[in-house]
Structures are given as C-alpha cells and as structure tokens.
Amino acid sequence: CQNCHMPQVEDPVKIAVGYTALLGRSPFNLHTFAGANSFMVDLIRRNKDALNIIASEANFDSTLAATNRNLRYNTLNAELSDPDFFNDSVGFELMLTNKSGHKFPSGYPSRRAIVVFTLTAENGDTLFSSGNFDSSGEIVNYGGVVEPHHDVITSENQVQIYEMNMGDVNGDFTTILERASVHLKDNRIPPLGFTNQHASYDTMRVVGAADTDSDFNKAGSTQGTGRDIVHYRIALNGYTGTFKATAKVYYQAVPPAWLTEMRTLDAPEINSFLSMYDEAPNIPALVAGDSLSELINPLHIQSLKIKSPVFYPNPTRASAGFNMQFQLKPEKIRVYSLSGQEMPLSWKKNSDGTWHINLSAAAGTYLVSVEVAGKRFTQRILLIPD
C-alpha cells in the first residue's frame, strides 16, 4: 500500500528521536497519504468554513496534487491496438491493465471508471462517441440503472463502466448501504494475480457478464492477467477520409445518479451535503488514455489523391537524419543502399505532423521506401559527410 499511496525517499531515515545509536531505515515512506477521491477533497475545501475545517489552502492543494498524480500514474495503463477494417467498419482493441494492488476502482461502491471512446474525422466532426459526460458529470444517455459489462461495443449507447453495483433483497438496484444484499455487477478490473481459486473469492467475486468475458483477467485458460480488453466495432457509414481514434479512462468518485435515492430523503445533514454537491464541479479525473491518428480504411485509399512524400533537407548530413512530409501515417519506412542492403533506422512523428527519420549509414546515396495501404513510394536521398 505504501509504495503507491505514500511518497518514498531512499535516504536512510531514523524513525525515532532521542536514540543517537539508532540506525536509519531505507526506503522511508513520508507521512503523506494520496488516495483517489479528489472530488470530495475539493468539495470539503470549497466548504471548509461551513464545516469548521482548519486545514490551509496549501494543505488542500498539495493533497489534491498528490491525489491526481496517484490517479494518473499509479492506477491504470491504456493501450489501443492498430485498427482492423471490415468493409465499411473498423475494429479496435483497448487493453486496460490495472497497475494497483487491488481492484480498480476500489473503496466505496459509488466509485466508477468510465471509458470514453471517440472517432474524429479529419475536419473535427465526431464519427463515433461512447461514454461522454454532460455538464453535470453524468454520462450522456445514461439511464441511472445497471449498465452491463461489455466485451464488444458497437453502439454509442453502450458504455464500458467499471464499477460495483449493489442490489437490495428484491434484487433491485440500490445505493443505500443498509439495503444492500447482493452484488448485481462487479466488473472492477482485478489486480495482477487475482484468480477465482482464492479462499476469499466469494467476498470479492467478479459478477455479471465480466465473469464470462474471455479476456477479462484471462489469457486463454490462465487467470490473473489484471487487465481487460474492450473490443470496439464501429460502422464508418461510407466515410472515406482519414480519422483519429481516442480512448480515455476517467475516474468518478460520486456520480450524480448515485444520489438519486438520497434526494428522496429529508434531513439537515443530507440537505447540506446535496447543496454542497450541486455547487461543486463534478469533473471526472483522467486516469489513462491512448490515441491513433491519420487512420484510413484501405478500401478508400484509392479515392484519395495521395501526393508523394517530400524529404528534407536533401542532401542532409549523415548524423542529422532527415524529415518527411506526408499526408498519411506511414505503415512502413525502409531505406536501402544502391546495392540493395536494408539500413537500420528509427522514425517518429514531429509536433508539426511531419516525420523524422534517423538513419545509421555512411555518406552516400540511398533509396527511401514508404508504404501505406498497399501503395509504395520510393525516392532518393543523399547523405553527405559530417
């Protein structure tokens, strides 16, 4: 727990005073605890006078900063696969890996993690969107009931929400702890090594469709991967241009729908809290994300007037590498000597949308081959001595 939730120093620290012979211990965890509920910390900060809280603004700011760092860097990893195209549709796999030592999200059952997946056209128009929030912090088109776990998402009305939902004695959804009797859903992502063979599994079961999802905490017949893979299958509806795919995972501590039952009750404490809640910005916290840009359906590549790539500077010094301007994301870049030998290289995208190519080669003339969607473009480039 300390490794993630408390900052660590490697220098030896004496853990008591008045003992000159006491040896320092290393590593030492500082007495600063970072959880995940930045929303409630901020709500208390905004109402600290009414709540008679004496902590300073600086204390709140440092706690919020530590909490947000913990969420962003110690919680989850998101990796979006290269697309698969099926006629007029596209498929992606989003792999989410739990980096913590417990289920994510964990703690009080109001907490949830939402996947926001978006396809955006080259002109900025939205081609597909699942999981977006409105100004109140609620998911668009969310009905306030149990959203099933999804292995495959094909519609904007399907949203992947990782959460634990409670049911009362009648099996109806409830947010009141005293009425909770059964689990209706628990697809929170387990930690690495979690299996259903543990002696305490009955108290922390995977419940609902996630239990039969073939890649939820599984790789074939092996359990304990600590990850889930969400499959997106999206119709392009005849769109022929380039597009961008973006996946982001957000954490939300107190969703608006969680307070629906509370709003039917009347008590000074409840009314005070609801007033504070309604005035606080309920902005979910970004936990992880990934994106792919300049994607295009190979079936539509012929409809584009693709210009040959432009390499510059040309000539260029052998140690400096060179840049490439090209309207699509290249699938392969290869460089050959005039004798046909393939040369080692690396390439990355520049901030201005061009590509930089580093080449391990002596001075001379080389052929640069760029491939995208079955097309190949070849040009010469001259490397001069440094």
Describe each region flagged by the PLM.
Residues C1-S214, A219-T225, V230-N237, A245-I296:
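Primarily the internal scaffold of c-type cytochrome electron-transfer domains
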Residues N87-G91, N314-G321:
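Short coil/turn motif common to extracellular beta-sandwich-like domains
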Residues S110-R112, F326-E331:
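Short proline/glycine-enriched turn/loop motifs at strand-loop junctions of beta-rich domains
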Residues A235-T240, S360:
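Short, surface-exposed loop/turn segments at beta-strand-coil junctions that are enriched for proline
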Residues G241, G353, A362-T365:
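A glycine-anchored, Pro-Gly-centered beta-turn/N-cap motif
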Residues S293-Y312, A318, Q327:
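Residue-level detector of functionally pivotal "anchor" positions at catalytic/ligand-binding pockets or at interdomain
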Residues A320-F322, Q341, L345, N358-D386:
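C-terminal tail/sorting-segment detector
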Residues L345-S351:
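Short beta-strand segments within Ig-like beta-sandwich modules, predominantly Fibronectin type-III
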